[in-house]
Amino acid sequence: MSNSNIQSVQKTTTAQAVNGRARLLGVYFTHSATPATLTLKSGGASGTARLTLTSPAAAGSQDLIIPDAGILFESGIHIGVSSAEITSVTLLFEGGAAA
């Protein structure tokens, strides 16, 4: 039995995903055949990048489970996508609240 309260949030465009202090535990995203970049920042759109992922040149989906206690985002989690090629982003997180 887990002692944590893992939550999820899903977005389809650049947006604030989580408000408040949170730990990112996992990411799942879907994309089309053109490479694009997904950036997760702490502190809003102009905040500090904590994780950057690039999609391959093939349509599909990618997932990343972050080990141990995850990545700490002190001031929420903001999703930034470089283009509409990234069609959906789902975050698994602990703490904070979905935006």
Show the residue positions of the predicted features:
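Noncatalytic modules at the cell exterior or secretory-pathway interfaces
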Residues: 25-27, 70-84
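A short, sequence-level motif marking secondary-structure junctions
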Residues: 54-59, 95-96
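Exposed aromatic-hydrophobic patches
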Residues: 62-69
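Surface-exposed coil/turn segments at beta-strand junctions on protein surfaces, enriched
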Residues: 19-20, 57-59, 72, 84
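C-terminal interaction-tip segments
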Residues: 1-22, 30-32, 82-99
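Local beta-strand/beta-hairpin segments that build beta-sheet-rich folds
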Residues: 14-19, 47-56
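Short, surface-exposed beta-strand/strand-loop-strand elements in extracellular ectodomains
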Residues: 33-53, 91-92
